[in-house]
Structure formats: C-alpha cells, structure tokens
C-alpha cells in the first residue's frame, strides 16, 4: 500500500504546485473503462455498452442517467470533489473550442480494454489505443491554443489516471466464445496484456505524460457476474489469483518504466485489498449485501440494469449496483480510503472507514 500512498501524494503535491497554462487547478486526464466512464459511449451510436437509461444515475445529481455505470457517482467523481475540481467531461462531448481541453478530459469508455479485441461484441467502444489517439488529438488542440512550448509543459504537468484490464478478463479471457481464452494459457495471456500495456504507456509518455497513476484490478472473482458461475455463489479463487498476477506484473512494469524513461513518475494504486475487505466484511462498512447486486440483472444478457430490471428498495445496503459495478455508497467508501491512505502515510495504510 506504500505505492498507493506515493501515488496519492503525487496527486496532492501536483495540485498544490503545478501551474498549467490557463489555471492553477490540477489538470487530470482519465483513461479507463465503465468504472470511470462519464458518458463517452452515449456518443457512439451503435455501442451496446451504454448506461444512458434508467435506473443508472437514479442517485446522481438530477436523478438522470449520464452514462455512468452506477446509480450515482464514480470514484473519480468523488475524488475530483475532494481535490476541489470538476469531474472532467467526456471527450466525445467536446468541440475544439471547449476550455476543457486545458482543464482535463475523461476518455474512459465502457467495454474498453488493453487489447483491441476486448469487448468487441459491444460493437462500439473506445479501446485503450483509441483513447490514446484521442489524447494525441487533444494535445494537437492544446498546441493550437497555447503554442508548442506551453502545450508541452501543460501535458507534462498534468496528472494521468489509468484504470484498465478488468474487461480484458471479464469480457475477453473469461468468455468461452472469445478466441483469447481458447488460444492462450493465462501465463501467455498476462504476458500479452503487460507487453501491450508497456507499449501503450510508452506511447503516452512520448506524448508528454509524466505523472501517471495506474489503478490495479480489484478481486474480479468476487463481482456478481462471476459469483453466479459458482454453485455456492462464492468468489472464484482462480480468477482472483489471475488478477493478483496481473497486478504484480503491472507493478514491475511501472517500476521498469520509471527506471528507463527520464522524468517518469508512474505509480501503481493497489485497491485490491480494500475492495476485498469491503466485500468480505460489508457490515463493518454499513452495508448488508455484497454477494449480489441491488439491481436484479440477468447476467446471461450483459448484467446491466435495464429499465425493466427490478431495483432494490434500499440501495445503500448493497456494495454492488449491477453485476459489475459498485454502488454510489461503495464508491464513496473506496474514495475515502484513497485519501485516508495518504493522510496516514507515516503509518501502515488503514482499511476503509465505515460510513458515518
């Protein structure tokens, strides 16, 4: 957890000292999947990975679906509030005249993965490579606005949050109809993932990113969509072991990149222990149910909370909103944990705190 505290320390210190071209606020660029999406897929006409319908957003400001895959806020939304900045808007919602290019953008897309083939059955989504290309275009817009030198400094000073890899398992390797799960052993697959990620992170570095936080995977074997595969509805230990191997390999990758790339400050945020403790001990944090979701979903047809799904009455009792995504209340606990880890940096990282 020391790596997590280092990552968050970089965030706060950057927020306090960085001076981007047009604002003294922290500038953040976010890459990810449905855990951090804020509405990019709303603009993809044929995407099947969308959350722009009820009951998504029922607890968000205004009570309407925004494209966030939860009943309320993402962890990114909550952290942005704690940092005193607005949650960055979705890239596909912007025109080149928008000031958001200078204040932060969210490129995350539901269904996205590290590998291009991940989530292909969603028809449209922004893969990690697509998101990197969007960032490349963003830099071109910034350069046109403020000039080459200022643009380079701007992207060097910004913070980059990356959270990908979950779909490479849940919507690729673990799916019997996807080729990767049939073609590769897990050792081969995790090597493919991390070698691809190596190239992608190197590309982002060449585009100017220096302060990068990569969010490791949580215990995917314990999410509702995986538990239903067990006769006892218990966590799938094999899946969790694979996740831990991916996390370990990714940590080593980031350490290697920091050694080889001048000025790189790539950090790994290990949230696996905190999420697992929340799932294993829900009552300690004010929850009642962690083995199924608030929205009664059909995991055989995607596991999303559709308008005809049955929603639970007490949403605050559930760790999970749908078959894949945490509830607003769980996201609050996990976001609080990230900050409490930083504040207690002189001592071992504490477990998440219960709701007040």
Swiss-Prot record:
Chief subcellular location: secreted
Keywords of the record: Glycoprotein, Hydrolase, Lipid degradation, Lipid metabolism, Secreted, Signal
GO annotations of cellular component type: extracellular region
Signal peptide: 1-18
Residue spans crossing the bilayer: none
This protein's record includes keyword Secreted: yes
Glycosylation site residues: 116, 291
Catalytic class of the enzyme: hydrolase
Active site: 34, 322, 325
Keyword check for DNA damage: no
Pfam families membership: Lipase_GDSL (PF00657)
GO biological process, one term: lipid catabolic process
EC number: 3.1.1.-
A GO MF term: hydrolase activity, acting on ester bonds
Localization of this protein: Secreted
PANTHER family: GDSL-LIKE LIPASE/ACYLHYDROLASE-RELATED, OS02G0732800 PROTEIN
Family recorded in the similarity comment: Belongs to the 'GDSL' lipolytic enzyme family.
Official protein name in the record: GDSL esterase/lipase At5g37690
């Amino acid at each position: 957890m020391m790596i997590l505290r280092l990552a968050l320390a970089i965030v706060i210190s950057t927020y306090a000292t960085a001076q981007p071209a047009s604002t003294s606020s922290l500038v953040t660029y976010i890459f990810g999947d449905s855990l951090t999406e804020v509405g990019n897929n709303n603009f993809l006409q044929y995407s099947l990975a969308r959350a722009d319908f009820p009951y998504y957003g029922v607890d968000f400001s205004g009570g309407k679906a925004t494209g966030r895959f939860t009943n309320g806020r993402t962890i990114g939304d909550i952290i942005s509030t704690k940092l005193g900045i607005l949650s960055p808007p979705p890239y596909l919602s912007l025109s080149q005249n928008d000031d958001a290019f200078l204040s932060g953008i969210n490129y995350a897309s539901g269904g996205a993965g590290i590998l291009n083939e991940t989530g292909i059955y969603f028809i449209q989504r922004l893969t990690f490579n697509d998101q990197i290309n969007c960032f490349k275009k963003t830099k071109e817009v910034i350069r046109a606005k403020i000039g080459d030198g200022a643009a380079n400094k701007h992207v060097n000073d910004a913070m980059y949050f990356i959270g990908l890899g979950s779909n490479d398992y849940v919507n690729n390797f673990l799916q019997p109809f996807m080729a990767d799960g049939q073609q590769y052993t897990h050792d081969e697959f995790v090597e493919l993932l991390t070698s691809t990620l190596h190239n992608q992170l190197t590309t982002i570095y060449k585009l100017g990113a220096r302060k990068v936080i990569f969010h490791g995977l949580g215990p995917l074997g314990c999410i509702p969509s995986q538990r239903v595969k067990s006769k006892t509805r218990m966590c799938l230990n094999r899946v969790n072991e694979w996740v831990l191997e991916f996390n370990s390999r990714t940590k080593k990758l980031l350490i290697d990149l920091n050694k080889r790339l001048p000025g790189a400050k790539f950090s790994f945020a290990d949230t696996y222990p905190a999420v697992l403790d929340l799932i294993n001990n829900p009552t300690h944090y004010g929850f009642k149910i962690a083995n199924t979701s608030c929205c009664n979903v059909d995991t055989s047809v995607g596991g999303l909370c559709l308008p005809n799904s049955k929603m639970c009455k007490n949403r605050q009792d559930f760790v999970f909103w749908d078959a894949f995504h945490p509830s607003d209340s769980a996201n609050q606990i996990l976001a609080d944990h990230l900050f409490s880890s930083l504040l207690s940096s002189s001592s071992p990282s504490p477990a998440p705190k219960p709701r007040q």
